Curated annotation (Swiss-Prot):
This is Penicillin-insensitive murein endopeptidase. Zn(2+) 1 binds at residues 110, 113, 120, 211. Keywords: Disulfide bond, Hydrolase, Metal-binding, Metalloprotease, Periplasm, Protease, Signal, Zinc. Belongs to the peptidase M74 family. Coiled coil: none annotated. GO terms for cellular component: outer membrane-bounded periplasmic space. It comes from Yersinia pestis bv. Antiqua (strain Antiqua). One of its GO terms (molecular function) is metal ion binding.
Amino acid sequence: MKNWIVGMVALVTMVPVMAATPWQKITHPVAGSPQSIGGFANGCVIGAQPLPLESADYQVMRSDQRRYFGHPDLLNFIHRLSAQAHQQQLGTVLIGDMAMPAGGRFSSGHASHQSGLDVDIWLQLPKQRWSQQQLLKPQPIDLVAVDGKRVIPALWQPQIESLIKLAAKDNDVTRIFVNPAIKKQLCLDAGADRQWLHKVRPWFAHRAHMHVRLRCPANSLECVDQDTPPPGDGCGAELESWFQPPPPSAKPGKTLPPPLPPSCQALLDNHFATE
């Protein structure tokens, strides 16, 4: 577990310094029947749709970055979740990064979010809708204490757990990544209803948002799903291992991104050949 964590730290710290990618130059979705292609961290999407920026139930942050595209299944999930949150009077759901118009690799900020099936949702639920200025330059609330071992009690709200639980109980959701301290708090608060917790996975950072991932759509034949999370609530030894100091390791070297799935490479080639 520890060696795997150290390796993944190297990957996470590498992402922000990756070079610009051609995917950022594609400003509109690729026409075609919606298809998520490849893996979540090495893929693309055909027929992506933009999440409507106007909704009574949610607001989209940093829309100027044009990261609000996804497979229709992802848009449907966001509509379902935000409607449920509205019905339960949790507050306004704040939508962060989804995917770029054709998916693909980001130059910074994410290793995944490439196949149109990932969305970041902030773990704050304002009662008052944000202004356009707040949405363009949002200020996250760090819920995790400095020592990284617990949430800050004054910032933790029951509505946050309710939002995560609603997302985890959605049939299309396979994983929700949160900071280990947030997972720990969910384990403490869950009570007898714990089945949903196995989808909530501890991960680096994620101190102010949850990263929700959907299963591959049934008609996306080239989409690569992850293995199902292990059974159980994930609140035992695996979770505790995240709070142990990592062993010393050599400084990681630079690694090149893997080759694209052939269909994604063909998509890029065709797009730039017709420019």
